[in-house]
Design a protein with these regions (language model features):
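Positively charged, low-complexity/disordered segments
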Residues: 2-10
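C-terminal "post-core" interaction segments
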Residues: 10-189
Length: 189
């Protein structure tokens, strides 16, 4: 199961749904859990993406669609030779009006960052927690003649406002600077 209901928040109007990963059935599981909570009177939601390392792009798009209006950009990809591809919300989601809080941490990555980035850029909810991992690369698998495979990075993911999800590691200096900055802000304790 990719989606879990958390009990014991006290207020029936606020409930938490935790998503462990973005698999093939995540959006379907989320909708089922959300509808159950709405029957119980849920008005506001806490979506816990802490420790979620990502998964399928389509699952992230389907989940973000639950919160966003029609034709709102969820994410786009663009590379040096790969043309820009845009992914939009259909506007038929079931939780477009209630208050939304998304929990993230330093292990929240990839598809999770796509969802939280879209919600943040559209001012649809509040993101709470530590800075997320920063994994935003589009990779294409290439089969080799010996039966092995490599993944070639062809583009990056960008939030609706144009922020690259991928951390910029052009050198180890940037990596170490980011690590020190995160430590100084208490993010790695």
């Amino acid at each position: 199961r990719d989606c879990l209901l958390s009990r014991g928040l006290g207020d029936v109007y606020k409930r938490q749904i935790r998503i462990n990963r973005f698999g093939a059935t995540t959006a379907e599981e989320f909708k089922k859990a959300m509808k159950e909570l709405q029957k119980q009177g849920m008005k506001d939601m806490i979506l816990d993406l802490q420790g979620n390392g990502g998964g399928y792009l389509n699952a992230a798009i389907d989940l973000a669609n639950e919160f966003l209006g029609q034709k709102e950009l969820i994410v786009y990809t663009e590379g040096r030779t790969a043309k820009r591809s845009d992914f939009y919300a259909k506007g038929n989601g079931d939780f477009r009006n209630g208050r939304l809080i998304i929990l993230v941490d330093e292990y929240t990555a990839s598809a999770s960052e796509i969802v939280s980035g879209a919600v943040q850029d559209w001012d649809r909810g509040i993101i709470v927690g530590r800075r997320s991992f920063g994994k935003g690369l589009v990779q294409r698998p290439i089969d080799l003649p010996d039966g092995s495979m490599i993944r070639l990075t062809i583009a990056r993911y960008y939030t609706p406002s144009g922020r690259s999800i991928q951390k910029p590691y052009d050198s180890t200096v940037d990596y170490n600077k980011d690590l020190i900055e995160r430590f100084n802000h208490g993010e790695l304790m």
